[in-house]
Structures are given as structure tokens and as C-alpha cells.
Amino acid sequence: MKFIVLLGALLALLVAVSADRIAREAPEMESVDEAVLTRQAREAEDPAVVEDAIRKFVRWLVQKYGINIHDLIDHFKH
């Protein structure tokens, strides 16, 4: 259960970082930001998109910090 909560939090973080990045790239285009956030909200409801985002984030964690995902899963199982 804790693992599912962690994955949900990671997904929310990914969406927030993406929206922030887009907002910094085009600050004068608020309607673009709203459209992107709407699209991301719709995609967040699609299980395949969520699963892909989680996989990408986990892959990034492993590459960036050398975190072993199996150790992380074992940590939250106990």
C-alpha cells in the first residue's frame, strides 16, 4: 500500500515538474499552460501513461542516483 502511495506521489511530482518547465519556457502563453495541464490531467487517468511515467522516473532514479529499485520496494514492504 505504501508503495502505491509513493508511486502516486512520484507521478504528481512528474506532472508538477513538467508543468513548471513548460511555464518557464513560455511564460507569456498562459493558455498554453492551461492546455498542457488539462492534457496532463487527462493522461494521468490513463493507466498506460501512468505506468510509463513511473517506469521513466524509476529508470532516472537508478541512472542519476544509483538507487536499487528492488531495495526500495523491499524497504516499503516492511
UniProtKB/Swiss-Prot annotation:
It is found in: Secreted. Residues 20-42 form a propeptide. Residues 1-19 form the signal peptide. The keyword Ligase does not apply. Expressed by the venom gland. One of its GO terms (cellular component) is extracellular region. Keywords: Secreted, Signal. This is Small venom protein 2. It comes from Pimpla hypochondriaca.
